[in-house]
């Protein structure tokens, strides 16, 4: 606990930083348990667990706990003064296994927090002094040191009171505080007397360690540097002053007191090394003294500045504090509270001092630190690509947050005249109900933008995205939420890309929507209905419903097959004659829920009335349905044809009415034809006169053939270019540079160079010419020809006779026009081409006679013999198989 001291000057109250949580290891087990009980933590467990609990409490709250004062048996006596090993500046000795200090390495880094102040390595303090390093330094504490010590004690006391208030710990009563302060004062007095008594005797450490207070760097392996102000108080550790220990492994917990009895003596240092160390220490002291003088000057300046700023801030802050106090008091009256002690004035003064000390920190609190990354100067050409990769991952959200918060900061500064304090109280602001309520009454908290809101702010709108992309018609409302909206639209616009199914963003499950659509039961296609399977199944189901349970079970054991037998001819006709193609969608046109119920406008044509529409309008359906006028005809005759379809032929309006129909307003009448005063039709040829006016009019009117309502495919241009190239090839040459093939073969005029008898006859067609024509393939040959079937009742005397005979006459007639009578097809040698036509006809007749004679001579005896031989061979092969198969008896398999 803190000790009682006269209050130091207010301007110089500066809280030292808290010590690390490692100093709890030096406490005894009883002290650890007492402190844990004080903070309301469990006290069971071994020593290491107790230390760990205290350390975790310090880390979480930021409060450094001081060593408790254990009471004696009578309850009021203070605990005995601590041993010399626990005094500040005289740390625990290390275990005997220390680093040998003979060869000094380069100055090590400052020791870790929690280690003791500088003693010779591996030299216990109870076994006499080490070789002397320096002689003759003033031992008595100066006025400045005492003043600083008193300031530290007062600051600790005030800080402890503040913490007790903020944590709502009102259980400590005022008389207990006074008793603790008295005990602390007694302890401090005893420690001072011990310190002075020891300074008179030889001390087991170099005397400069008790000298001037300052920051010292480590001087090698022998002497560790003290960090922070060295105070003479053993129980109260100044906040933030880490106590360095000599190097080496720390002693196990609970063995600190045993080290005092360790009889091992450290190794002695040679004189040459001692002189070197003394020179180093003297240089270090000079440096430290200069630094201390500079620090004193800066402290004096800052204290003057702070006192000036405090006077201005006090006037503003006092009125606010009074209001806050009144509010808090009102709330405290409502809550059940315990009666506080008498010393309210002293606590009020302390509050003022603490607020002033906090106010002095305000100029430092306003400073904002900005971290700027240093960009390396690398002139490697490949470094640019490497740098671009990292630039892609830079976060821009933080910059936007700062920009948005700038106007909010200005509002905060205007609302709060006194700047807010940062530090301990700001961390616990949320826990303090009073202060948080007051702030909520003053002003609403500035809203912090979440990542979701930031993402929404950075999104494109649908209109912006449509402007940025090449195909805006593909953009949908949810495309802006994609990670890369431009890439998504590009992928959607790519040719032959299949879209993601629409139900990806639906809440309900796929095909589970029933939004007012009456789904009809499944209907069989018409070509399957014609087989009559539907009626047969319905009849069978009715029979099964009438059956008893017994007969049903009997059928399960011995099922009867062939209940629904359809004639094979019916099935054949259904699937080969009447089958229709199912409705298929094109590539990339995915099915979505309710697609089959949508109207397909592509199938509809203006002017053609479907059967459904006719039935709904009350018009007749059938072959003579076109003779009944539509109900809108009379309105069209009055107001004109529809402007969207100017060239649509509507009977009774701009085209003649059907035959055996008449104009008039009777049932089935076609109204009145639209004519002008002179009797001429207004909109078209209503009377069917086919006058020249209407024909020329229709010719003059150019119809726009460009497609509308659907985008043209992107590959249309390429196909058009190919068609143009093909058409160019087909056109005859108009330039006149290419000579046609026929022109050189015909002699333009004059006499023939070949005599009359030597001309090639026109009647002969060579086989070569036929083959060439077939090779050219100018006409696509027919794949097959259906032969008509002839039926004969009797086979007759023919050996291979059949009732089915095919009529070949139609095929022969289709082959082409009959050859001319004079033309003869004969295979001729080149020498025989010189013969006259009479000789050739004679040769042909001889050839025909020879063929007829061969046909008459031919008989079928050889074919009959072959057939009989084959039959015998089959019988021979079948006999041994039957003999083998007779040995085994197999059950006859039935379908």
UniProtKB/Swiss-Prot annotation:
Listed result of changing residue 509 to A: Moderately diminished formation of omega-N monomethylarginine but greatly reduced formation of symmetrical dimethylarginine
Coiled-coil intervals: 140-199
Cross-linked sites for Glycyl lysine isopeptide (Lys-Gly) (interchain with G-Cter in SUMO2): 10, 280, 400, 412, 492, 543, 770, 790, 843, 857
Superkingdom of this protein's organism: Eukaryota
Effect of residue 507 to A: Moderately diminished formation of omega-N monomethylarginine but greatly reduced formation of symmetrical dimethylarginine
Composition bias type Pro residues, residue spans: 90-114, 122-133, 241-254
Compositionally biased tracts (Basic residues): 322-338
Biased composition (Acidic residues): 712-732
Bias-annotated ranges (Basic and acidic residues): 1-10, 277-286, 347-359, 400-414, 422-431, 844-869
Region annotated Required for interaction with PRMT9, chain positions: 401-550
Effect annotated for changing residue 515 to K: Does not affect methylation by PRMT9
GO MF annotation terms: RNA binding
PTM comment, free text: Methylation at Arg-508 by PRMT9 is required for the interaction with SMN1.
Location of the region described as Disordered in the Swiss-Prot/TrEMBL record: 1-24, 65-136, 197-373, 400-453, 691-757, 844-895
Residue list for modification Phosphothreonine: 298, 311, 780
Subunit structure: Component of the 17S U2 SnRNP complex, a ribonucleoprotein complex that contains small nuclear RNA (snRNA) U2 and a number of specific proteins. Part of the SF3B subcomplex of the 17S U2 SnRNP complex. SF3B associates with the splicing subcomplex SF3A and a 12S RNA unit to form the U2 small nuclear ribonucleoproteins complex (U2 snRNP). Within the SF3B complex, interacts directly with SF3B4. Found in a complex with PRMT9, SF3B2 and SF3B4. Interacts (Arg-508-methylated form) with SMN1 (via Tudor domain). Interacts with RBM7. Interacts with ERCC6. Component of the minor spliceosome. (Microbial infection) Interacts with HIV-1 Vpr.
Linked pathology: Craniofacial microsomia 1: A form of craniofacial microsomia, a disorder characterized by a spectrum of craniofacial malformations ranging from isolated microtia with or without aural atresia to underdevelopment of the mandible, maxilla, orbit, facial soft tissue, and/or facial nerve. CFM1 is an autosomal dominant form characterized by mandibular hypoplasia, microtia, facial and preauricular skin tags, epibulbar dermoids, and lateral oral clefts. Affected individuals also present skeletal and cardiac abnormalities.
Full protein name: Splicing factor 3B subunit 2
Organism, as annotated: Homo sapiens
């Amino acid at each position: 606990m803190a000790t009682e001291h006269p209050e130091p000057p207010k301007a110089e109250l500066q809280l030292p930083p808290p010590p690390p949580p490692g100093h709890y290891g030096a406490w005894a087990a009883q002290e650890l348990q007492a402190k844990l009980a004080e903070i309301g933590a469990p006290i069971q467990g071994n020593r290491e667990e107790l230390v760990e609990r205290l350390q975790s409490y310090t880390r979480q709250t930021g409060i450094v706990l001081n060593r408790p004062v254990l009471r004696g048996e009578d309850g009021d006596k203070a605990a005995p003064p601590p041993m010399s090993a626990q005094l500040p500046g005289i740390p625990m000795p290390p275990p005997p296994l220390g680093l040998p200090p003979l060869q000094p390495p380069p100055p090590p880094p400052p020791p870790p927090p929690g280690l003791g102040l500088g003693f010779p390595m591996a030299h216990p303090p109870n076994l006499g002094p080490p070789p002397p390093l320096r002689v003759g330094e003033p031992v008595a504490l100066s006025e400045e040191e005492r003043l600083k010590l008193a300031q530290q004690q007062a600051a600790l006391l005030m800080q402890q009171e503040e913490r007790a208030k903020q944590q709502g710990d009102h259980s400590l009563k005022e008389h207990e505080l006074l008793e603790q302060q008295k005990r602390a004062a007694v302890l401090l007095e005893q420690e001072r007397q011990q310190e002075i008594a020891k300074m008179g005797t030889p001390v087991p450490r170099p005397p400069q360690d008790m000298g001037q207070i300052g920051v010292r760097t480590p001087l090698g392996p022998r002497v560790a540097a003290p960090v922070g102000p060295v105070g003479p108080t053993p129980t109260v550790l100044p906040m933030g002053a880490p106590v360095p220990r000599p190097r080496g492994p720390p002693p196990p917990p609970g063995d600190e007191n045993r080290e005092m009895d360790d009889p091992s003596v450290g190794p002695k240092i040679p004189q040459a090394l001692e002189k070197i160390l003394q020179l180093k220490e003297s240089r270090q002291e000079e440096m430290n003294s200069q630094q201390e003088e500079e620090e004193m000057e800066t402290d004096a300046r800052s204290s003057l500045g702070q006192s000036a700023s405090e006077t201005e801030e006090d006037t503003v802050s006092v009125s606010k504090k009074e209001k806050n106090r009144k509010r808090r008091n009102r709330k405290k009256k409502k809550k059940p509270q315990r009666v506080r002690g008498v010393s309210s004035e002293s606590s009020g003064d302390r509050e003022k001092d603490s607020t002033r000390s906090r106010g002095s920190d305000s100029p430092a609190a306003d400073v904002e630190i900005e971290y700027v990354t240093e960009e390396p100067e690398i002139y490697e050409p490949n470094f640019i690509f490497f740098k671009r990769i990292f630039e892609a991952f830079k976060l821009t959200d933080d910059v936007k947050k700062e920009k948005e918060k700038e106007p909010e900061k200005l509002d905060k500064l205007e609302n709060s005249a006194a700047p807010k304090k940062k530090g301990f109280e700001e961390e616990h602001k949320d826990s303090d109900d009073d202060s948080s309520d007051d702030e909520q009454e003053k002003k609403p908290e500035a809203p912090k933008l979440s990542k979701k809101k930031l993402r929404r702010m950075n999104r494109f709108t649908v209109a912006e995205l449509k402007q940025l992309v090449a195909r805006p018609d593909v953009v949908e409302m949810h495309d802006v939420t994609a990670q890369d909206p431009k890439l998504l639209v590009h992928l959607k616009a790519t040719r032959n890309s299949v879209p993601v199914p629409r139900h990806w963003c639906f809440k309900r499950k796929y095909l589970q929507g029933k939004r007012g659509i009456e789904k009809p039961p499944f209907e069989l296609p018409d070509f399957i209905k014609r087989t009559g399977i539907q009626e047969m199944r319905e009849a069978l189901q009715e029979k099964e419903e009438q059956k008893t349970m017994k007969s049903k079970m009997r059928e399960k054991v011995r099922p009867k097959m062939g209940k629904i037998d359809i004639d094979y001819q019916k099935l054949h006709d259904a699937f080969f004659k009447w089958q229709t193609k199912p409705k298929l969608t094109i590539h990339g046109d995915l099915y979505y829920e309710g697609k089959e119920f949508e109207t397909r406008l592509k199938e509809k044509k203006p002017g053609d009335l479907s059967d459904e529409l006719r039935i709904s309008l009350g018009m007749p359906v059938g072959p003579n349905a076109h003779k009944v006028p539509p109900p809108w005809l009379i309105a069209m005759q009055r107001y004109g044809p529809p402007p969207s379809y100017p060239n649509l032929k509507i009977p009774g309006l701009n085209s003649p009415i059907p035959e055996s129909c008449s104009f008039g307003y009777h049932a089935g009448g076609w109204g009145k034809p639209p004519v002008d005063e002179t009797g001429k039709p207004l909109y078209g040829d209503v009377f069917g006169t086919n006058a020249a006016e209407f024909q020329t009019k229709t010719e003059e009117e150019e119809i726009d053939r460009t497609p509308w309502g659907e985008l043209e495919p992107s590959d249309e241009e390429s196909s058009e270019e190919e068609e143009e190239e093909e058409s160019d090839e087909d056109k005859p040459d108009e330039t006149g540079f290419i000579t046609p093939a026929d022109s050189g073969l015909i002699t333009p005029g004059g006499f023939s160079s070949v005599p009359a008898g030597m001309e090639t006859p026109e009647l002969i067609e060579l086989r070569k010419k036929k083959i060439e024509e077939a090779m050219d393939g100018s006409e696509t040959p027919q794949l097959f020809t259906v032969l008509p079937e002839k039926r004969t009742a009797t086979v007759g005397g023919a050996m291979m006779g059949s009732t089915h005979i095919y009529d070949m006459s139609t095929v022969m007639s289709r082959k082409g026009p009959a050859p001319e009578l004079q033309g003869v097809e004969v295979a001729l040698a080149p020498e025989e081409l010189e013969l006259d036509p009479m000789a050739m006809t004679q040769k042909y007749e001889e050839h025909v006679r020879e063929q007829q004679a061969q046909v008459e001579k031919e008989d079928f005896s050889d074919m009959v013999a072959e057939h009989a031989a084959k039959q015998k061979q089959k019988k021979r092969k079948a006999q041994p198989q039957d003999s083998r198969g007779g040995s085994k008896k197999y059950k006859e398999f039935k379908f």
